[in-house]
Amino acid sequence: MFRTFGIAAAALGLMGAAPADWRALDPENTLVLETTKGRVVVELRPEFAPKGVERIKLLAREGVYDGLQFHRVIDGFVAQTGNPNNRDGGTSRHPDLPPEFSFRIPAAAATVVVERSDAREGFVGATPFQAVSAAEQALRPDPRLRGWGAYCPGVVGMGRQADPGSANSEIFVMRAAARRLDHEYTVVGRVVAGGEAVQGLAVGEPPKVPDLMLKVRVAADLPESERPRLEILDERGRAFREHVESLKRANGAAFSICDVEVRSRVR
């Protein structure tokens, strides 16, 4: 099940977390969805998909997402929304976007937590990624890390049609891990609060009574009093590293990057 942990749950495994282990969200890259099941907060990561993130913020600022249905919600898979016609295939007035299925970023911008002979895995902010192995990277003239978003629970992607370059306005939230989507759909960020609301959405294709995105805003555009007052466990900090190591010990060979769930607290 997809969960986001608030401070009460987080404290169970993070008693030693210091103030420096937490970080604030960037209001310009935080999307706030007011839904019929409650508030959902998404941390957008332009490092993964600058054009996709720019488009989603533009549509939020234009009010395109307000009132749209979660028109396809599948248990153990995804919740889709964002089409102005409230069904698959709808688009905004803006042109389709090129695929952003992989990225290249400075290695210092990423936190690697798993090193294998065939790949590396880690986080940029709260969003998980997989990257080529260090050995393969060393063979390339470009020193930047080459990776792609990992479709773990809570990850947000852009929907499309059969054409890889047909992403436009549709977004979807993973209700469970589906790594087969890696390299196939643009990753734009991850839910950092409100996972319970995503899990509570009415299920169906379409649901009999669909839930709605009542209002979608970029946090920077909200009055200070209405912005999410959240801090996220910093993936670059000691407490995060210790948390990941504890999961590795507990899960052994079965450990997956998708086992690492978002930890947040109210500030």
Q: Residue ranges of each PLM-predicted region?
A:
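Bacterial N-terminal signal peptides that target proteins for export
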Residues: 1-6
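Hydrophobic alpha-helical targeting segments used for export or membrane insertion
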Residues: 7-16
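Cyclophilin-like peptidyl-prolyl cis-trans isomerases
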Residues: 16-267
